[in-house]
């Protein structure tokens, strides 16, 4: 399946993300697009943010290239090309001017509606308990939650990008071993393109990070993973339960922390640093140890 030309294509994606991030970092510093130090942050000096714009942009261009080369369908182009473009754009605007939580939530629901509509998800018959439109709302809520949950992962250096690389690599390996990859070519193409894009950004985001992905990266990745879950489950490529296992620690940490905050904190939806991995990073004063520790823990969990 993977030809030399496709390996070259992935190498170009990787190199483009490296070069693009390097250039964007200079741009962000020049125009003061940085995360300053405050009581909510865990970094020790102002750091450029919004780097997710780069690997998101490279991914989107790659999706359009695959579409025009007739390697992926029109629906996949709309969801991962057009939809992810809006996801990254919303995130980047939030990185620059800070969108209110309510407005962000509306945009995220629109993104969820887009995915479910384009993929023409037929939710009738999944259960007799809810009708079609109720299932549509439940599915939309779950997609919005995943987008936000992935945003919560981006709390220390290298955490969100390493999570993406680990999750995608696991899925690629799973498809290769369990499923006939020839029957999942489009899914594999998207996963590998996303993987190459993320690896290109990792170099700059690994502790100590010289640039943050920001909401432009975390919302983009959350949207992509949500869309991948919908596409792979309705087409019987990857089961929903496999996705739950693969997300493991990352989803459980964000979900449990949010539920606890809903119970004990009045403004639970506000920015915070209460996740378990953030508490460890604050106590140990070392992002690298925590990020590596979570990776090792997650690998053991997957085994």
Label each residue range with its predicted role.
Residues 193-197, 286-303:
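Hydrophobic membrane-spanning alpha-helices of multi-pass integral membrane proteins
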Residues 22-48, 256-288:
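Cytosolic, membrane-interface loops and tails of multi-pass inner-membrane proteins
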Residues 2-252:
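"…together with the soluble PPM/PP2C metallo-phosphatase catalytic core" -> "…together
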């Amino acid at each position: 399946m993977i030809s030399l030309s496709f390996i070259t294509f992935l190498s170009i994606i990787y190199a483009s993300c490296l070069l693009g991030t390097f250039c964007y970092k200079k741009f962000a510093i020049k125009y003061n697009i940085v995360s300053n130090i405050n009581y909510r942050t865990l970094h020790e000096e102002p750091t450029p943010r919004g780097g997710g714009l780069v690997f998101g942009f490279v991914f989107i261009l790659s999706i359009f290239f695959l579409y025009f080369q007739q390697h992926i369908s029109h629906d996949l182009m709309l969801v991962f090309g057009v939809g992810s473009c809006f996801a990254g754009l919303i995130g980047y605007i939030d990185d620059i001017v800070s969108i209110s939580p309510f407005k962000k939530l509306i945009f995220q629901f629109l993104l969820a509606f887009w995915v479910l509509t384009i993929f023409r998800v037929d939710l009738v018959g999944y259960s007799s308990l809810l009708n079609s439109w109720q299932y549509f709302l439940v599915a939309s809520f779950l997609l919005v939650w995943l987008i936000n949950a992935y945003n919560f992962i981006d709390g220390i250096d290298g955490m969100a990008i390493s999570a993406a690389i680990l999750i995608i690599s696991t899925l690629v390996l799973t498809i290769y071993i369990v499923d006939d990859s020839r029957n999942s070519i489009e899914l594999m193409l998207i996963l590998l393109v996303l993987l190459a894009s993320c690896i290109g950004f990792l170099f700059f985001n690994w502790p100590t990070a010289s640039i943050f992905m920001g909401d432009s990266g975390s919302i983009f990745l959350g949207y992509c993973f949500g869309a991948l879950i919908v596409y792979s489950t309705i087409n019987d490529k990857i089961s929903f339960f496999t996705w739950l296992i693969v997300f493991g620690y990352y989803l459980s940490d964000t979900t449990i922390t949010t539920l606890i905050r809903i119970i004990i904190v009045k403004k639970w939806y506000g920015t915070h640093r209460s996740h378990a991995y953030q508490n460890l990073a604050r106590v140990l004063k070392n992002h690298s140890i925590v990020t590596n520790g979570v990776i090792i823990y997650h690998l053991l969990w997957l085994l």
